[in-house]
Amino acid sequence: QFLSNYNIPSTGWVNYKYREHELICDADKKTLCDIEVIVKSKNLSKNNQINQSVSPCIVSFDIEVYSSQKNSFPKAENLEDCIFQISAVVQHPDKKIEKILFCLKPDHTEFDFKLEDAECRFYLDEGRMITGFRNFLLKLKPHLVIGYNIMGFDLEYILTRDNEKHGVNVTTNLKFQQHGFYKYKL
């Protein structure tokens, strides 16, 4: 209704009256954007001069989980039901595709190497792997994070494992709780 009332496109560019905004300080930001502002709706207008479309950076991810109970679905609360791999596919704004596998390697050697079309990053334990995935997202700052059933399983599983087993909140810097992930009680 808002877009219709103010004749603003659902995608594209908008203008706002420059002096009629409030700049948000870093501590209060709701996103990972470099700049956030609060603008009254009456100070917004459709931009007809920019025809360029946005090319977002998109990350799609999936987790692979071990179940310690035979013929049973894994439970994040079970210590043995660990995440052993996180796969991520990145589509960069220039349309370049990058594939990364975050993997457990249960010996004392951490190393990275490339497969033909994917980079593999190995970690000694699940906590380090989840932290590596978090740091990857923080550095990349994707515009969109997508995946099959990530809201119904993957994200909640990662958060539960990290909070309960490792005592680290993977979302501390990702601000998931400020993007509608309220059911995870972060």
Pin down the residues of each PLM region.
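The two-metal-ion catalytic cores of nucleic-acid processing enzymes
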Residues: Q1-L186
